[in-house]
């Protein structure tokens, strides 16, 4: 009896978001029949919700403008911040593990061509975000602080976002005959007697044959509570990625004996904690911190860090372990602002200040600081066991008053002596336009001495995890013998990241997805056909 398949193609791509679309479109462009399976009922994944900025050193728009960006400068920037404790500029791999260095080299060497390919084949229209700084542009090692970001362009010439990226890439895929099937969650892979991957299984006993290979582009495991607790110690809540990011490739890798790497790392962002508790799939992270007359404090009323730095680095202070108290005392912290910020920054995107007519259920209000503290502690109490053991300390109000007095003095002077808020270009970029602030530092304005005051509960979240099996530059997933498993590939957050602990810039996810999507497509299209018999799949 012959094998019955629900679909058969040269290439099966799993996951119809950024990495998946880039892989599928390139594979089809190279002449391969391609099936694209998506677990949700619509395509786009987390990429649909994103700004869709792609960070690509030496991109073609930089070249057209004559902006120099050497391979050496790009590699130094990547290596220095990905692995700060290991970085060695004199070492052949800059101090990085060889496989990470190889991946970063492949990204730098192929990124410009990968982006230009999508443009040349008509899959995307893009424009240059040449005013967008790298997140560590204030460090001397960053020789090219601006110009590496490329963004989608709408038909009217305006900047696009993840919705536009998804629209264009879906159209490009369909134009090339890619068979897109939504509501097809993949559960595992099929192998032949030689151990080669020859297809996948999906829900409802559906099976799909991949003659040359299967490419997983399924995202990380940020919404898998068990995996997140196991590998991230329960510290990070699920972020703004789509709920279908359940770590399916983790399970596949375990079954095939593929080692898992960097499972304790994540791309992070602060997030409004009570929004997380609602399980709203439309949730977004706090990618910007609105306001100048605002601070973020812990349960002692003390600031925890620079409120204006990048979202990943704003998450790090939340994870500080208090040795004396043996606790993560900043795990829930509190954005606190006055009426100036509440009015002037109302409805600012990616922030916590609601629009004047917006939903205020995530905001606690008080006519005085005393009233605000009482209301905030009552809100924490109402969360019960979900408050992560955090209540306001008895000295919160005293600490807060002292903190506001110190912040106000620094705002008048224009220098944040504690956390250098406003010093870096990225602080000022995320702050946005200077709004009616007469003080020297545009990111700081004294908080009002009278109410009302407002607060929101903030937690650190995993935008997406960075761990998984190791992959070659061509996406081949390495098995227990450190050799690629024939027929199995991975691109994106489902495989181990080479960027270590860092979030180097906006677009550091899209840029590599676009690059490695092309490289994986080339590799799988060139791979030999894997033979399979019905008896081997029984």
Regions found by a protein language model. Give the residues of each.
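A glycine-rich dinucleotide-binding beta-alpha-beta segment and adjacent secondary-structure elements
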Residues: 188, 389-498, 502
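Extreme N-terminal leader/targeting segments of oxidoreductases
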Residues: 1-11, 29, 499, 503, ...
């Amino acid at each position: 009896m012959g094998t019955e398949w629900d679909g058969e193609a040269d290439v099966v791509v799993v996951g119809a978001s950024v990495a998946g679309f880039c892989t599928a479109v390139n594979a089809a462009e190279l002449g391969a029949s391609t099936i694209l399976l998506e677990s949700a009922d619509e395509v786009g994944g987390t990429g649909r919700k994103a700004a869709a900025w792609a960070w690509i050193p030496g991109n073609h728009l930089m070249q057209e403008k004559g902006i120099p960006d050497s391979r050496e400068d790009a590699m130094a920037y990547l290596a220095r911040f990905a692995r700060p404790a290991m970085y060695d500029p004199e070492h052949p791999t800059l101090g990085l593990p060889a496989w990470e260095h190889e991946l970063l080299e492949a990204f730098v060497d192929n990124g410009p061509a990968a982006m230009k390919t999508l443009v040349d084949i008509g899959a995307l229209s893009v424009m240059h975000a040449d005013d967008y700084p790298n997140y560590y542009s204030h460090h001397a090692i960053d020789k090219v602080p601006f110009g590496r970001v490329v963004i989608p362009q709408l038909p009217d010439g305006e900047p696009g976002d993840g919705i536009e990226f998804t629209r264009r890439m879906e159209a490009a895929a369909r134009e090339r005959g890619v068979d897109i099937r939504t509501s097809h969650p993949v559960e595992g892979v099929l192998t032949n007697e030689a151990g080669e991957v020859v297809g996948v299984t999906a829900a409802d006993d559906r099976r799909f044959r991949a003659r040359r290979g299967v490419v997983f582009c399924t995202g990380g495991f940020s919404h898998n509570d068990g995996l997140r607790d196991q590998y991230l110690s329960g510290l990070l809540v699920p972020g703004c990625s789509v709920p279908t990011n359940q770590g399916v490739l983790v399970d596949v890798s375990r079954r095939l004996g593929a080692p898992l790497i960097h499972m304790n790392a994540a791309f992070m962002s602060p997030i409004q904690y009570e929004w997380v508790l609602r399980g709203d799939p439309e949730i977004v992270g706090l990618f910007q911190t609105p306001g100048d007359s605002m601070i973020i404090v812990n349960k002692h009323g003390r600031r925890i860090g620079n409120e204006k730095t990048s979202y990943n680095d704003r998450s790090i202070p939340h994870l500080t372990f208090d040795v004396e108290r043996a606790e993560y005392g900043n795990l829930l912290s509190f954005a606190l602002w006055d009426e100036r910020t509440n009015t002037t920054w109302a409805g600012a995107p990616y922030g916590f200040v609601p629009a004047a007519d917006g939903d205020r259920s995530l905001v606690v209000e008080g006519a005085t600081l005393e009233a605000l503290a009482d209301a905030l502690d009552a809100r924490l109490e109402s969360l019960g066991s979900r408050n992560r053991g955090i209540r306001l300390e008895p000295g919160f109000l005293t600490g807060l008053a002292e903190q506001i007095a110190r912040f106000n003095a620094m705002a008048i002077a224009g220098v944040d002596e504690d956390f250098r808020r406003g010093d870096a270009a990225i602080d000022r970029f995320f702050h946005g336009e200077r709004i009616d602030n007469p003080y020297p530092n545009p990111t700081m304005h004294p908080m009002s001495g009278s109410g009302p005051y407002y607060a929101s509960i903030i937690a650190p979240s995993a935008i997406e995890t960075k761990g998984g099996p190791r992959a070659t530059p061509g996406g081949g997933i390495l098995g227990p013998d450190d050799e690629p498993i024939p027929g199995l590939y991975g691109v994106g957050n489902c495989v181990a990241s080479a960027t270590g602990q860092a979030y180097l810039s906006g677009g550091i996810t899209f840029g590599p997805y676009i690059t490695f999507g092309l490289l994986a497509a080339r590799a799988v299209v060139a791979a030999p056909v894997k033979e399979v018999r019905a008896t081997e799949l029984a």
